[in-house]
Amino acid sequence: IDIFEKLELEDDDVLDTYLNAMFEKLQIDSQLAQASQGDLASQESITSQEDIASQLKEEIKLTRKDSTSLNDIFDKEIEKFEEEEFWRVKAEFEGFTAQLLNYKGKKAELKNESETDELLNSLNEEFYVQNVEAKNRNRETKAPFTTSSLQQEASIKLNFSSRKTMLVAQKLYEGIDLESETVGLITYMRTDSYRLSNIFMAPAKKYIEKTFGKEYVGSLKQAKKGPNVQDAHESVRPTSIDNTPVKVKKYLSKDEFSLYSLIYNRTLACLMKPAIISTTSVELKNNDALFRSQAQALIFDGYLKVYGKYESLELSVLPELVKDTNIKPLNVEKTQHFTKPPARFTEARLIKEMEDLGIGRPSTYSQTITTLKNRKYVSITEKRFIPSDQGRLTVDKLEEFFSKIISVDYTARMEKVLDDI
C-alpha cells in the first residue's frame, strides 16, 4: 500500500497485475467448478434430446443462452400483428410547420378520414398563438464503453457486427506496431464497468483544457451500477490520451482506425461538459384543435465538439412569433398512415436486451449472435434479425419441451445463482 501511495496509484489501477501474479499459485475452486457443472447440466438438458432433434431434422447445438435469445427474436406479437389506420394533420406556415397535438382536449387520435374531415371543417382561417416558450437544457454525454455498449455503438455507427467489433478490439488491445515498438492502444475489452482510473483521467482533462479550453472540462458521471455488474476491469478506453486517432492512423487498418476513433472520442467526451441546447416551442389554437411546432438551437457544443459526428442533432429556427396574435396558414394538410409492427431486433438492440435481462455475460454476447447466424436460425435483412423456418420450428419445439429453461426469467436467475456460487 505504501508503494501505491508513493506512486499515486489506486488499488484498482494495479488490480489486474496483482491478480495475474496471484493466478500462478491459484488452486482449483470447487465452488466455481460446481457452478460450471450446473451451467453445463442445464445446457445438456436441451442439446441431448434425440426425439426433438429428429423432429427438427438436425442436432440441437444451442446453449441455454442461445435458446433464450432465439426465443426473444421470434416475437409472437410481430407474427400476429394487424395494422390499423390512422390520420395526421399538419398546418404549414411561413417558415415552419405545426403538427396536430390535441383535439377536443385529448391526444389527437384520428382513426379514419371522416373524423379527420370533421376536424378540418371546424378550423377557422386563422390560428391563435397561444404560447411561445424557450428553454435551455443539457444534453448529457454518455458513459465510457463497456463491452456491451461498445458492441451496440459500433453496430449502429460503424455497421460492425458484434463479432467484428470484438476481433478488431482484440487486435487493438494486443498491440499495434508503432514504428519501433508494439503498443496496446486500448484497455481490456471484456468488461461491464463504467470506471476510469485516476491515472488516465488526470492527463485526459489536461488534454481537453489545452486543446479545447477550460470551459470544456467536465467530470465523469457516476453511472448506475446494475445488479449483475462484476466491475473487474475498468471501462474500454485508450491506454494513452496522447495516442490520438490522427497520430496513429497510418499504423491502423480502416476498421482498426474506425473503432479506435470511436473508443478514443467516446472516452474523451465522457470527461467533457454537457452540450447546451435551446428548445423553442410554439402552441397554436384553432377551435378544438391544438397544434405545436418546435425548433432547437445549439448554445454550447460541449462534448459534441469531439462526439458530434456520432450523434444526430436536428437544428432549426422558428420565425419571431408573438403570443396572443393570429396567423394565417399557407396550407392545412391531412395524411393517411397505418400502424407498423414492433421493429425486429438489430444486433445492437439484441445485445442491449440481453444485458438488461441478464442473459449471459459481456464475453458471451458476440458468440451467442454468431451461433444463431452460423446455424442459420436467423437471417439479416436491413440490419434486422429475421427468424428462418428452421429457427421458427426450433423455437416451437423448445417452447413445447423446455419452456421453463429457455424463459428469460429462468436464464437470468440461473446467471445470478452461478455468479453467487
Task: List each model region and its residues.
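Core catalytic DNA strand-manipulation module of type IA topoisomerases
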Residues: 1-39, 44, 48-421
